[in-house]
Regions:
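Predominantly soluble domains enriched in secretory-pathway, periplasmic, or organellar proteins
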Residues: 1-248
Length: 248
């Protein structure tokens, strides 16, 4: 893969591998394995040619008896695993996002923190209290002022002041959660219901659930929600229903 070419990287959680695919044919062109269980989630930074994959542990959210503490760094051009960041004392790393300040923010579920990583040194430079040992996924507001974690079994969303690195509070939802998204205008956080095929729409101005949307013709709960960049559609996937819902 040359510096100016295109490529695709994928995480195989079941096989504990990282795959490099042909973006036209989707054929697997390179495989990197040998990781502890389990490779989880993915952050790609095209500008630097780097990708980051956390090692969560051998369980699932809320039931992870052997949590791990590593974040693996990949060179996209060389298709190589080039470094492993040790996050200890923080454990069970999961969702990670690139902040507006160029730092990486990653939930460390069992430690109830969002760890902050400097990409130049590949070191943990701070840890922010998330208020929950069930903080699984996170999102960052488009203006960079707030970070939100969805705290699965707790049925709450933590609100963090990102510049101050301070937990402001938690928003209660009617039931446990399985995913989170934020609208491109930053006015709405979507929390995905883990018990029913429903979405909770949270007003970021007052921190309250203002509406519930039932996913029609989806028999089981959903997990992942993503807005289109132009705010025109919200896509919601339900793994156990084999469905993708598109919401205007």
């Amino acid at each position: 893969m040359t510096k100016n070419s295109h490529g695709m990287i994928a995480v195989d959680k079941i096989g504990t591998k990282v795959l490099f695919l042909n973006p036209q044919t989707y054929a697997t062109e390179a495989v990197i394995d040998g990781f502890p269980r389990t490779v989880h989630e993915l952050l790609v930074v095209p500008e630097t040619g780097r990708a980051y994959v956390p090692i969560f542990g051998d369980g699932i959210h809320g039931r992870n008896p052997n949590p791990q503490h590593h974040l693996c760094v990949f060179d996209l051009h060389k298709r190589a695993h080039i470094e492993t960041i040790d996050l200890r004392p923080y454990i069970a790393p999961h969702t990670l996002k690139l902040g507006p300040d160029g730092l990486i923010y990653i939930t460390c579920e069992n430690s109830a923190v969002v760890a902050v990583i400097d990409r130049d040194s590949n070191k943990v430079v701070a840890a922010i209290d998330s208020g929950s040992t069930n903080g699984h996924r996170l999102i960052i507001a488009p203006d960079g002022r707030h970070l939100y974690t969805e705290n699965e079994e707790d049925g709450t969303v933590s609100v963090i002041d990102l510049p101050k690195r301070k937990l402001l509070g938690k928003i209660k939802t009617p039931r446990p959660l399985a995913g989170i998204a934020i609208a491109p205008d930053g006015r709405t956080v979507v929390a995905v219901d883990d018990a029913q095929p429903t979405l909770f729409l949270i007003d970021t101005a007052d921190g309250r659930v203002r509406e519930e949307i039932v996913l029609k013709d989806v028999p089981k709960p959903a997990q992942i929600a993503r807005y289109a960049p132009d705010n025109s559609l919200l896509a919601v996937t339900s793994l156990n229903s084999d469905t993708v819902s598109l919401i205007d």
